[in-house]
Every structure is written in structure tokens, then in C-alpha cells.
Amino acid sequence: MAIVGLGTDIVEIERIEAHVARSGDKLARRVLTEAELAIYIAHSQPSRYLAKRFAAKEAAAKALGTGIGRGVSFQHIHIGNTPDGAPTIRFTDGAQQRLAFLNGIFGHISIADEKSYAIATVILESC
């Protein structure tokens, strides 16, 4: 195994809360996939959920070396959870193409939050 990408992002949860208060679900609909959006809508702390997913997708885009744009969109990065609750990451479309370009085969992700911040780190590995 070799590491072919590493990205970290931190988000101030209050900024996401303020954005949601101003614009409703506009940011969520831009950032989240349909499956993630369904969880967001039903979540007891939707702004916190959105902040963690935003940080995770930004970290993934940094690990891919593109940021959001340049062929990779938020919609190409899917964040889920195992039955035990551990976060998972899956790439499609432009993000999958970029992962293949890097000879990457798998992404590892860690997401954490506390009162004010959400943070995520993504490591991409090759065989």
C-alpha cells in the first residue's frame, strides 16, 4: 500500500448554522447526495450533520488534489456509515476518475466534531 492522497478540512459549525438560517436547505442541496440529504432532513442536528459532511467532502477533494471543481463536485463524493457507525467514503464520476488517475483504489476517512467545529481527514491508498 502507498498513500497517494491526504486531505484535511475543518468547518466552524456556527457558520453552517448561520448559512442554513439565511438560505434554508440551499447549501445542503448543493453539497449532499440524495441519500445524504434524506438523512440531513431527518437528523436531530441537521447543521452539525451538514458541517461534518462538508468537511469530509472538502478533505476528500484536497486528497484528490483538485479541490471542488476541476472535474470533481460535492455530488461525486459519497459519505456513509458502516452498521457500527464508522464513516465510509465512496467516489463516483469525476472523483472516481481522479482517484484512478492517482492509481488509488480506496479511501479512508475520519470525521470528528465537538461543540464548535467539525473536522475530517481523508487518506487515499493505492495497491
Curated annotation (Swiss-Prot):
The keyword Lipid biosynthesis applies. Keywords: Cytoplasm, Fatty acid biosynthesis, Fatty acid metabolism, Lipid biosynthesis, Lipid metabolism, Magnesium, Metal-binding, Transferase. It is an enzyme of class 2 (transferase). It comes from the Bacteria. Mg(2+) binds at residues 9, 58. Its main location: cytoplasm. It catalyses: apo-[ACP] + CoA = holo-[ACP] + adenosine 3',5'-bisphosphate + H(+). One of its GO terms (molecular function) is holo-[acyl-carrier-protein] synthase activity. It holds the Pfam family ACPS. Its cofactor is Mg(2+). Transmembrane segments: none annotated. It is found in: Cytoplasm. Its EC number is 2.7.8.7. GO terms for cellular component: cytoplasm. One of its GO terms (biological process) is fatty acid biosynthetic process. Transfers the 4'-phosphopantetheine moiety from coenzyme A to a Ser of acyl-carrier-protein. Belongs to the P-Pant transferase superfamily. AcpS family. HAMAP family: AcpS. This is Holo-[acyl-carrier-protein] synthase. The lineage of its organism: Bacteria, Pseudomonadati, Pseudomonadota, Gammaproteobacteria, Alteromonadales.
